[in-house]
Amino acid sequence: MALSFRISSSSPLICRATLSNGDNSRNYHTTDAAFIRRAADLSEMSAGLTSPHPNFGCVIATSSGKVAGEGYLYAQGTKPAEALAVEAAGEFSRGATAYLNMEPGDCHGDHTAVSALVQAGIERVVVGIRHPLQHLRGSAIRELRSHGIEVNVLGEDFESKVLEDARKSCLLVNAPLIHRACSRVPFSVLKYAMTLDGKIAASSGHAAWISSKLSRTRVFELRGGSDAVIVGGNTVRQDDPRLTARHGQGHTPTRIVMTQSLDLPEKANLWDVSEVSTIVVTQRGARKSFQKLLASKGVEVVEFDMLNPREVMEYFHLRGYLSILWECGGTLAASAISSSVIHKVVAFVAPKIIGGSKAPSPVGDLGMVEMTQALNLIDVCYEQVGPDMLVSGFLQPIPDLLPVIPSEDATVEIDPSVDPFEPSIIFFYKTWDLYGMWNITIRYHTTVHVKWYLALSKKHNLLILHPKTLKANKFVGVENPKAYDCVEKIRTARSPEEAALIGRSTLRQKPELVRNDWEDVKIEVMYKALKCKFSTYPHLKSMLLSTIGTVLVEASPHDLFWGGGREGEGLNYLGRLLMQLRSEYLGESSVSAEKTSSA
């Protein structure tokens, strides 16, 4: 029995699902599976932009099997997929079924996604997988059910082969976040192109081009969906790559160079950070003079006591990277595989033969001497891309998160080694953290990224902050029209990531546009921005007040001013300002209580 879609003339319906004859329950499962796969496909349309949020897609279908509306999360901080879908469906949402690739990510008191489904009159919700983060898992499902909405989760409420395949598609589109929830390293993909005889270059080192133009376009798409691209020093020396996504808009990944000796050329395409940043990771103490040269070009250098793929990936895990694309040579690839940090392999095999006993292969020595030791890929896929064959598969399976929901009767054991009078520390950084919403760059769907906006203002005292949107609604006294243009682009950016990219690029390309007194006023500006944010969202204020007696630390390993640093050496000004704001709110509460009691 098959399910197909055809265009429907009944506006505003988009398409109609047509079922062939067969068992009703099987048809039911097939319909659910098809719409869940569609939701998963939708969620991937903004891959790379939604981080640190998951990829969300939503399809609204009527009882007759028609798609009434659909939507996907464009980027972190934009309108939820569920809200977009019910807006598109309009009156057809009432009594309909909503298909979600993942449980709604409503968190930190923001119930936009769930509220949209409830208010639209959705009767049933089918969820591909529960939210992978422990502190969010099951919350939205419980809330939906509390409103009388039927909620089914694939693999829990019913099972079948077709539903299992649909569930797998949901796991695939959010594999990076799922891996983060279960491990301490980002989801890593090893990508390479090789000839039919297994060579990634000729004996001379020449490698342009092994694969076809179509395959290289797919590589750009892979980069655009990754947080970072990593190469070794040899790749920089021989190929001088740019490692850009080359799509002209949206997400551009960070470039990472991993080199033990720091034996790198003084001039390289990767040292141009006007559009995208570059991070060089190396052994501690390596070529200090060259480190200074890189720093003068705007390249960040991070030193390690023991430079190896595992340590490097754990570091970038702390920095909040979800997905890494490895485009390195065979030596580094072998080291990464041996360190168990590679989860997936994507290989483009070209119908060419180059030969050569010294021609490099995609993976160096792994210490294996028998074929029985070979690593077998799982969930292997084959796809023809132009003249090339794309082979992909997993070295490590995607963790299958069980719906571990704490019992209402569960008790918490007290650790006798912990001093109850010693103030505890609350770390926050990314949105997946329990208190991650405190980061100033994390916003809800109506706000804008204010850090860069205010940094580029020449007249902060004349800047007005709108309390509902946390945006500057009036800009006065700009001395340079280019600064005004930049601010307008930031103000109208669709997401905080896009706004931050505009700001970073402007600071690199036109540093003269930054207000001269920024270093003197940035703490004051940040405090006002925090007050505006917490005044706009009362639930954030309530969460802040619930942390009385704790020390708040932004766990940024690389920002030594706003964050706590890699080893606690940072100044943690963001955490300090939050604690100052908490004290201010507590003072206001005390004054209010005194007035009430005196009355």
UniProtKB/Swiss-Prot annotation:
Transmembrane stretches, start-end: none
Pfam families, alphabetized: dCMP_cyt_deam_1 (PF00383), NADAR (PF08719), RibD_C (PF01872)
Transit peptide endpoints, chain numbering: 1-17
InterPro entries recorded: CMP_dCMP_dom, Cytidine_deaminase-like, DHFR-like_dom_sf, Eubact_RibD, NADAR, RibD_C, RibDG_C, Riboflavin_Biosynth_HTPR
GO molecular function annotations of the record: 5-amino-6-(5-phosphoribosylamino)uracil reductase activity; diaminohydroxyphosphoribosylaminopyrimidine deaminase activity; hydrolase activity, hydrolyzing N-glycosyl compounds; NADP binding
Superkingdom assignment: Eukaryota
Documented EC number(s): 1.1.1.193, 3.2.2.-
Pathway: Cofactor biosynthesis; riboflavin biosynthesis; 5-amino-6-(D-ribitylamino)uracil from GTP: step 3/4
Purpose of the protein: Pyrimidine reductase involved in the riboflavin biosynthesis pathway. Also has a non-functional N-terminal deaminase domain that lacks the catalytically essential zinc-binding residues. Catalyzes the hydrolysis of the N-glycosidic bond in the first two intermediates of riboflavin biosynthesis, which are highly reactive metabolites, yielding relatively innocuous products. Thus, can divert a surplus of harmful intermediates into relatively harmless products and pre-empt the damage these intermediates would otherwise do. Helps maintain flavin levels. Has no activity against GTP, nucleoside monophosphates or ADP-ribose.
Assigned protein family: In the C-terminal section; belongs to the YbiA family.
Comment field (misc): Unlike bacteria that have a bifunctional, two-domain RibD enzyme, plants have a monofunctional reductase and a monofunctional deaminase, each having an enzymatically inactive domain.
Protein name per the record: Riboflavin biosynthesis protein PYRR, chloroplastic
Organism: Arabidopsis thaliana (Mouse-ear cress)
Lineage, top ranks: Eukaryota, Viridiplantae, Streptophyta, Embryophyta, Tracheophyta
Underlying gene: PYRR
